[in-house]
Structure formats: C-alpha cells, structure tokens
Amino acid sequence: MAESKNIAIDASPDKLISKTYLSRAVEPFETAALEALLTSCRHNNGQEQVTGALLYHGGYFMQLIEGFDEAVERTYARIVSDSRHEIVSVLFEDHISARFFPDWSMGFRTSEGADAASIEAIYETASRSAARFPINDFLLLFSNDGD
C-alpha cells in the first residue's frame, strides 16, 4: 500500500510548508476503507501538488502533508471536516526549504509497517514540546520502504 504517484512540482522553497497532525478514527478502518481513503487522498493531493505520508495504528492517524502554503491549508481544512475521524490536533507546522516526500502524493504505513513504540514515542515527545516536533523520528518510520 505504500504506492505513490510522482507529482510535477513547481515550487519556490520559501513558499513550502509542512504540517503534521494526529487524529482518531471514529470507527476502526479495515483494509478496503484504508485503500479507498488512500485513493482519494492521492487524487486530491495530486491536484493540489501536496505530498506527504500517512500512518495508521490502533485507530489513530498521523499524517505529514507538505506543499505550497495555501494548498496545504486547503488540504488540511478538507481533512478536519472529514467525519471519519475526530480530535484532529496539529503536532507541528513549519516552513521548509525542501519536501521530505517529493515523489509521494501520499505514502502510507499501518502498524504492520511501523514500530508501534516509535509512533507512541513520537506522540509523547510532541505532546511535551510545543516548540519542536521530532520530524526525523517520523521520517525514520518510512526508511525501510520496500513496497
């Protein structure tokens, strides 16, 4: 499921932002529902030139989206209004000089593809530190992308 779609990017580095959020699914997502969600995300993100990665574990989503400021904000507004999840909390947002996932319209991992303890540690660290989110830890979850 870690399929991605290359996106043509015409970006000025000073206009790029990255936003990472955590949310809770209203109901657990089965494989078919996750695949449908990813298909929709990849289509919408391709239209907006938004790239990123999504983790799903134990009924929780953690997603990093990146792109032009306005496109990321439109995408995030769409995410917040989605009734399939609740308690959407921004963990980190910042201007970036380059994308972390330039070729992924939406990378994906479930708890089978990521260490659950790592996900929990990231969330705990982010909760304690409002100033800085450990983005490198999040990115390491995708370092063994063999899909």
What kind of region is each of these model predictions?
Residues 2-147:
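Charge-rich, low-complexity N-terminal segments
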